Amino acid sequence: MNKPVLVVMAAGMGSRYGGMKQIDPVGPNGQVIMDYSLYDARRAGFETVIFVIKHEIEDAFKAAIGDRVSKAMNVKYAFQQLEELPAGFAVPEGRVKPWGTCHAVLAAKPLIDGPFAVINADDYYGPEAFQVMYDYLSTHAGDDFYRYCMVSYLLKNTLSENGSVARGVCIKNEDGTLQSVTERTRIEPCGGGAHYTEDGGESWVDLPGDTPVSMNLWGFGKSFLDEAEQRFAGWLTENLPVNPLKCEYFLPLVVTELIEENKAKIQVLRSTDKWFGVTYREDKPLVVDAIAHKTAEGQYPEKLWE
């Protein structure tokens, strides 16, 4: 069994935040959020990282993080490109938005030869998540089912004080596997928990603070890439006529189909760490403070890669 590798999705445009937030410093020596994720991943056992980026940001990305991390990890690059579509499909006129998280992972397919974990570039996941993920991927191969996993967080540990967030709300089976994950695109804090709306704020549905949610930290086998690739053309046929400029091929979509078809079992691993991220510019000072606190406590050195 090959060692698990880490895939970092960094091609998104950071639309809500305005700017290339993946390389916006938050640490005491100019570190970005991704530095801390990669440092935690390396400590957990991951030795290879594949960055999925856009060609346009390649030089800036390497200067900001890739070259630095390459001192400690084997660094590879994959490029998510709009025109990378199945035969018979073309990019709709006016489309600039990337094709989503599943398309991002497919960009890395030629570089993946075993189990892999997927993370967002701009989320702080904490050390526990990478450890449980690495341990699972290192010890679980497929059998009668594809054996995948995800790390869930408590919803209350993933909210922003500065606006709504999108989260994958999870329901678990009795055996701890994932029954379903539903993307809620507008969740806001409310009392001790949260609530979400699907109709622009006309009505709200309460969610308890301890609801398990996905932060796009998934663990897959190589089989997932074949499944995602085979389903892409069908997804395009269905979605392009409806929403040509904004539709996105998301990881949970394929995960849900594989669960419904009884092909995959996705173990829900837990992290009690608090998530940090810069969804809005106003979030940044909170992240800077949190990192400073963790550094002062000795969880991270002042200089990560030296």
What are these regions (language model features)?
Residues 283-306:
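Generic C-terminus detector
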